[in-house]
From Swiss-Prot:
One of the record's GO molecular function terms: translation release factor activity, codon specific
HAMAP family listed in its UniProt record: Rel_fac_1
Protein name per Swiss-Prot or TrEMBL: Peptide chain release factor 1
Gene of this entry: prfA
SMART domains in the record: PCRF
Gene Ontology cellular-component terms listed: cytoplasm
Mod. after translation: Methylated by PrmC. Methylation increases the termination efficiency of RF1.
Family label: Belongs to the prokaryotic/mitochondrial release factor family.
Modified residues (N5-methylglutamine): 238
Keyword Cytoplasm: yes
UniProt keyword list: Cytoplasm, Methylation, Protein biosynthesis
Biological role: Peptide chain release factor 1 directs the termination of translation in response to the peptide chain termination codons UAG and UAA.
Top-level taxonomic group: Bacteria
Amino acid sequence: MEKKMFNSLMKIHQKYQDLKQLLETDQILNDQKQYLQIAKEIASITEIIEVFQKFLDDQKVLEDAKTILIQEDDPELIQLAKVEIATMSKNIEEYEKKLLILMLPKDKNDEKDVIVEIRGAAGGDEANIFVGDLFKMYHKWADSQKAKVKVLSSSLALAGGFSQIIFQISGQKIYSKLKFESGVHRVQRVPATETMGRIHTSTATVTVMPKIDEKIEIEINPSDLKIDTYRSSGAGGQSVNTTDSAVRITHIPTGIVVTSQDERSQIGNKEIAMGILKSKIYNLELQKQQQKQSDFRKLAGSGARSEKIRTYNYPQDRLTDHRINFSTSLKPIIQGNLNPIIEALLAQEKTELILQNYANK
């Protein structure tokens, strides 16, 4: 193991011991907020400590076995020492690999909930129907993760689906799992209205943003906002409300426009619209920071129209993620089993981080 990494692990080991002792003091035991904060910090490094302790234990056994080889003349003891050295060396190599991954820099947003925006792009009615299919896919996946889904804003389309839908998913480390969903999703299939059996291609754009919590302050000058109210409408623009409860907010400096009409009151819609706006502004800043990272990690959260990330080919029952050349059966994915593609994308992220880590040394 490299000296720099070993020293870092020793510091984490000492920090772990200090925190464990601190957790048992009367001052912390009587302060629930501090107790939970320290307990959470301990939990965040426990896996590293457990693997590192195994590394240290096996390193000690390895050194003892090497000493036996040098000092002993007994053939049986020498043979046992050789077996021990081979076993411990293999174990240590595996622990080093695990620690390398565990020590990779964490994305500060990984623990956050997400706000997802899906918009129909090329393809007219088919694109809007595809938006609805993607929403159902993410909803089913969220259900499988015991996560909660809340629709924040939606615009129904006459032919089915949505021209746009914005929703929140709340659960455990949701952003870490969905951050690479941003981009252009392409569908190839025969529409129900197609009489000649021709395959049509449509697209939808997906943007995944970390939900901003109260701890993060996003400064928005009220004078930078243009707020309009209007009557909420259903599919095809039909009015479904007799009061101006829907809200449209324009952030003048960035040109970001957000709307909300699904709540019954203007106050409720304004609150939701402001929440979406804050996440969009935060995501904009996040994209600027990601320009300094690897090409693959830049894709998280961008949702740029030029980035065709995935194709859903219905006739061939095939889903392909073009960023990592990953293909699998489409049906399980569209039914909400996103874990195979999520795991493949996260594995690629780890590989990129390891390569980047070595490149910076």
